[in-house]
Amino acid sequence: MKKIALCYDFDGTLCSGYMQNQELIPNCNLDVKKFWTSVTENSKKNNIDPTLSYMHLLEEKMYKAKVEISKQNFNKYGQRLKLFSGVNDWFKRIKDFGKKNNIEVEHYIISSGLTDMI
């Protein structure tokens, strides 16, 4: 049996936009657009990677808003993520298709997002 791997980005591929925009950022009493603008500004001002900038600012904002920073809390947000239509059964359908064609299909999600939400 042949083996293939399918790799996906999460944000914008499996769900619309950034996963944090759906509930996490709004639950910190933040405007999503303003948050990402501040991430860009912080990144340029401090000459740091935008991903590190967003992680730092999100942690800071969550702490200030008293939003729990824990694996369990991120899991709760992840369970409520709204995925694109068809994503929920996509992985099983492709695995089944692979089996019928003597192919083992493995799925991998590659993301710089919060993996505990995925």
Locations of regions flagged by a protein language model:
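Alpha-helical substrate-recognition element adjacent to the catalytic core
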Residues: 1-118
